[in-house]
Swiss-Prot record:
InterPro entries: UDP-glycosyltransf_plant (IPR050481), UDP_glucos_trans (IPR002213). This is UDP-glycosyltransferase 79B5. It comes from Arabidopsis thaliana. Its EC number is 2.4.1.-. UDP-alpha-D-glucose binds at residues 261, 320-322, 337-345, 359-362. One of its GO terms (molecular function) is UDP-glucosyltransferase activity.
Amino acid sequence: MGSKFHAFMYPWFGFGHMIPYLHLANKLAEKGHRVTFFLPKKAHKQLQPLNLFPDSIVFEPLTLPPVDGLPFGAETASDLPNSTKKPIFVAMDLLRDQIEAKVRALKPDLIFFDFVHWVPEMAEEFGIKSVNYQIISAACVAMVLAPRAELGFPPPDYPLSKVALRGHEANVCSLFANSHELFGLITKGLKNCDVVSIRTCVELEGKLCGFIEKECQKKLLLTGPMLPEPQNKSGKFLEDRWNHWLNGFEPGSVVFCAFGTQFFFEKDQFQEFCLGMELMGLPFLISVMPPKGSPTVQEALPKGFEERVKKHGIVWEGWLEQPLILSHPSVGCFVNHCGFGSMWESLVSDCQIVFIPQLADQVLITRLLTEELEVSVKVQREDSGWFSKEDLRDTVKSVMDIDSEIGNLVKRNHKKLKETLVSPGLLSGYADKFVEALEIEVNNTKFS
């Protein structure tokens, strides 16, 4: 048993980063460690319900200074449009005095961070360990370390040439609006910290992890996916209305589509998507947010669509219980955006997987799973990012048709990978070993 430690956490102020950091904080608290979690004031209310150990995890609100481009009252990445997140970076960069004051007062053993480059330098001044914890994929971290890969030109020693952005993706899906200055700052944090860690596992991204270790010249620690307990293992059951509806179809025949609560289609692409689902001729259930500029999903549906598909298709506005739906025997295919949670729910299900990625990290993971591991397929898109109803229909049918060669290939590969991922203790073992490694780091610091 290692020494109990006190950790600071200073994640990027986006909910897609703060929530995974809180999952890790819960794991540390479960093992008896204390966490001081830095966050903007307005995030406190949304994150509080996810804090499973409020006696051990203390939220410490920070006040962002005014900077150019940061609207009054904006404190998180979701307060700014996707095209311009830089003001949050600049504001977080200016919080060093507030963080240092807390370090002096509370004397932590470790500080976790992801994007703020000066944390390792500050930690060294105070004799504490800096842990760079990346919740983006190893593919994305590797691309940050080899920025030409972001432009579609990975270096010769890049381990997986297929896992890079191409064509329109290098512009449309660029990580931070093509800001090489930000790439440089993130790289500085990765190379100067004491410990590099990523929310992934060797079974998915082993080769890329090796590349990152080589580039950073230090051992890489992996936490595994660090997901909260799945609903289908927590005693919950699928709502009766969905269970009854799904029971009306043959096993493995229903196509389930979900894109999370943070993604919004353009209206014309949403209508094309719906028409593609109709063209398939298969039963389907779609969980989606209203497209941009539309007050409701129903208002945005193609004319006459609901009437034509009412016996075999539902478009539902908002969130559904994904893991419970995926475990229903009637569901045979999962179409999603390759968001982190949906990606993992795909991999541990028995469903065929179709991806329509939207962001850079999602595009890279889709390439890994589709072209390298061949456990999924993706919908083909034009240079603008547009996909047609025929593209969607053909992609889904390629994995749903019994005689499809590609469908049988990805099904075999997916089954094999799933058996590995769900083997007892594999994923939970990553988190346990990660915490043990941190305890050793802290012990070595105390007795050095």
